[in-house]
Amino acid sequence: MKAGVLALQGDVEEHIQAFRKAAQELGRSVEVVQVKRPQDLREIAVLAIPGGESTTIGALARRTGLLDALRDAIKGGLPTLGTCAGAIFLAKEVRDSVVGETKQPILGLMDIAVVRNAFGRQRESFEVDLREEGIGALKAVFIRAPAFTKAWGSARLAAPLKHPELGQIYAAAFQGHMVATAFHPELSTTAVHRYMLNLAKT
């Protein structure tokens, strides 16, 4: 089985290592590849979209022809994890905590609303312990993190947190074969990557 990591920008290597370690823990044979072109999507059984800068990821995906290819593959059932900026890229509604509505290129596939930079900039980074059904307990690392504020359709918000200004917000969202996290699981745990490998068809 092949797992793919979108390799346009962000912490690509950390996701590659997290998939490799998760596969080892599950006793599975998994090759992890970088996804840089539309044709790279053809053979993978699961995908991670890393954090980074969401407007840059969207612009590069459009320029390389990956925007439509990613949308088609994920709509077709490819299990996909979006972390931090990757979660923003998956969402249908995106606004910034400072500038409001954004016009950035997004996949627009998950029925969730996301606020970019909800926890401030780099200096407001933090870690918390979270527990989520199906994934278990994990240490979550938030870096310039977004927040999920609303879900509709078949999407489900998870991992609740109290935000000083936004009130009750959520650090994760699930919708069928798609998972979005406001935090960076690749930096502290293999639990989310194990979950994704278990979603994938062998």
Swiss-Prot record:
Active site residues per record: C84, H184, E186
Disulfide feature: none
UniProt-listed GO biological process terms: glutamine catabolic process; pyridoxal phosphate biosynthetic process; pyridoxine metabolic process
Keywords carried by this UniProt record: Glutamine amidotransferase, Hydrolase, Lyase, Pyridoxal phosphate
Annotated residues for binding of L-glutamine: G52, E53, S54, R116, I143, R144
A molecular function (GO) term: glutaminase activity
Catalytic activity, as annotated: aldehydo-D-ribose 5-phosphate + D-glyceraldehyde 3-phosphate + L-glutamine = pyridoxal 5'-phosphate + L-glutamate + phosphate + 3 H2O + H(+); L-glutamine + H2O = L-glutamate + NH4(+)
GO cellular component terms attached to this protein's record: cytosol; glutaminase complex
Entry EC number(s): 4.3.3.6, 3.5.1.2
Database matches in SUPFAM superfamilies: Class I glutamine amidotransferase-like
Superkingdom of origin: Archaea
Alphabetized CDD domains for the sequence: GATase1_PB
Alphabetical list of InterPro entries matching this protein: Class_I_gatase-like (IPR029062), PdxT/SNO (IPR002161), PdxT/SNO_CS (IPR021196)
Functional pathway: Cofactor biosynthesis; pyridoxal 5'-phosphate biosynthesis
Hydrolase listed as a keyword: yes
Keyword Hydrolase recorded: yes
Function (record text): Catalyzes the hydrolysis of glutamine to glutamate and ammonia as part of the biosynthesis of pyridoxal 5'-phosphate. The resulting ammonia molecule is channeled to the active site of PdxS.
UniProt cross-references to HAMAP family, sorted A to Z: PdxT
Assembly mode: In the presence of PdxS, forms a dodecamer of heterodimers. Only shows activity in the heterodimer.
Family to which this protein belongs: Belongs to the glutaminase PdxT/SNO family.
Protein name: Pyridoxal 5'-phosphate synthase subunit PdxT
